[in-house]
Swiss-Prot record:
It is found in: Cytoplasm. SUPFAM superfamilies: Anticodon-binding domain of a subclass of class I aminoacyl-tRNA synthetases, Nucleotidylyl transferase. Its EC number is 6.1.1.16. It comes from Helicobacter pylori (strain J99 / ATCC 700824). This is Cysteine--tRNA ligase. Monomer.
Length: 465
């Protein structure tokens, strides 16, 4: 297995800290709003990593957190007259619902920052004791980045003392010094009683503490195997996580760093701050979650994905091919083609080379369809094909539906009944040699984007996009 390590800026062999085990920490969302397609892409990217590792024989523990203490949450909760717990729980439920729709596997653990306050306080106390942190006059506590000789080594941001000094009001020693603890400021603020005084943790200390509490190995040069997240988190968040872990514990937080690329809308980076977010829940109103997943995984995880509906519909053709083939082989048993399994898994073991893997998949779909055309009753062949498709389901997380359900997505039960009635009416017309009426019914349904296919087993139908 090879992965691209952001810190080394090259592909490297994955050599876990413990043989055949992989510990992964993925930065999850700050839950003050609904999740957008950038969140979806990150979740899918590292879901693919997890699936690939598991199918390669690794025992994987994947932790993805919820940041439920943050300025944005506090500000929105105040505006909506809610507690931060009420507000964050709404968006945690929304995020979970969205990712379930995208067939992202549940993490091994989903810690909330609010559940690890004691651990954060202990870590800050350690940093103060070791003289890596300092308190300013308003009670806030900062990490002194000048004390960490490796600061900037992950993101390559300059960490020299030549960084501009900032106002005495904040009393930060260097611009890149970051807050560990925010003291309680009174009305409209949120604070927790602690040995540090009443206040709340900074963003960066939250993740480092949760990594330490949920995954960190004792007596190892690294706490975990892989730390992952979006490219936008590389600096300052991941840089600061790495810094405070080195300072507090004398070890690196992660052996490998992996980052997924941005999602662009109209060639601009999508973000809430730019006001061009495309929420997952809105996309799901137009497209099934599997169709969205199939599209988002189709571009290599490190590349920028420029979202547009034309490409999404083009990518859906791949799913259509999978389900048409699946429809032909349902109800058969057999073993997977070992060459197909080896070839497609090796593609994914090469830093999740999904483009190459999808090319192998397309080749399998074409060749096996041809073989079925030549020998449609070959049960062994059908069983092998179904086993191949099952492996794709496990590896890529697509192709898991019943074909009939897939091709009838977006059609209500009452509409299905109307279509079945029309098919029955058309059948009677054909029996009575009224082919004009039969053709008229087919055309009427086609106008409603319902396509009919006559098969030896009867007429089947599907919804067109």
């Amino acid at each position: 297995m090879f992965i691209y390590d952001t810190k080394l800026k090259q592909k490297v062999p994955f050599e876990p800290l413990v043989h055949n085990k992989a510990n992964i920490y993925v930065c999850g969302p700050t839950v003050y709003d609904d999740a957008h397609l950038g969140h979806a892409r990150s979740a899918i990217a590292f879901d693919l990593l997890r699936r690939t590792l598991e199918l390669s024989g690794y025992e994987v523990v994947l932790v993805r957190n919820f940041t439920d203490i943050d300025d944005k949450i506090i500000n929105k909760a105040f505006k909506e007259n809610k507690s931060i717990q009420e507000l964050s729980s709404i968006y945690i439920e929304s995020y979970t619902r969205d990712l379930n729709a995208l067939n992202v596997k549940q993490p091994s653990l989903e810690p909330k920052a609010s559940e690890y306050l004691d651990a954060m306080v202990r870590m800050i106390e350690t940093l103060l004791e070791k003289n890596f942190a300092y308190r300013v006059s308003n009670g806030d506590i900062y990490l002194d980045t000048s004390k960490d000789k490796d600061y900037g080594s992950l993101s390559m941001h300059n960490s020299s003392v030549e960084f501009s000094r900032i106002g005495l009001v904040q009393e930060k020693r260097l611009e890149q010094d970051f807050v560990l603890w925010k003291s309680y400021k009174g009305d409209n603020d949120v604070g927790f009683d602690s040995p540090l005084g009443k206040g709340r943790p900074g963003w960066h200390i939250e993740c480092s503490s949760m990594v330490f509490e949920t995954l960190a190995l004792a007596n190892a040069p690294y706490q975990i195997d892989i730390h992952a997240g979006g490219t936008d988190l590389l600096f300052p968040h991941h840089e600061n996580e790495a810094c405070q872990t080195r300072c507090a514990f004398g070890v690196e937080i992660a052996k490998y760093w992996m980052h997924n690329g941005f999602v662009n809308i109209n060639n601009e980076k999508m973000s809430k701050s730019l006001g061009n977010s495309f929420f997952i829940k809105d996309a799901l109103k137009n497209y099934d979650g599997e169709i969205l997943r199939n599209y988002l995984l189709g571009v290599h995880y490190r590349s920028v994905l420029n979202f547009n509906e034309e490409d999404l519909l083009m990518s859906k053709k791949r799913l259509d091919k999978i389900y048409r083939l699946k429809q032909r082989v349902l109800g058969t048993l057999g073993g997977i083609n070992p060459n197909f399994k080896k070839e497609i898994l090796e593609c994914m073991q090469d830093d999740l080379n999904v483009s190459k893997a999808l090319s192998v998949l397309e080749s399998m779909l074409s060749s096996t369809n041809e073989k079925l055309d030549q020998n449609p009753k070959n049960k062994a062949l059908k069983g092998e094909i179904l086993a191949n498709l099952k492996f794709i389901e496990e590896l890529l997380g697509i192709g898991f539906k019943d074909p009939s359900a897939y091709f009838q997505l977006g059609v209500s039960e009452s509409e299905k009944q109307e279509i079945e009635n029309k098919i029955e009416e058309r059948k009677r017309a054909k029996e009575q040699k009224d082919f004009l009426k039969a053709d008229s019914i087919r055309e009427e349904l086609l106008q409603q984007k319902i396509a009919l296919m006559d098969t030896p087993q009867g007429t089947i139908w599907e919804k067109l996009f």
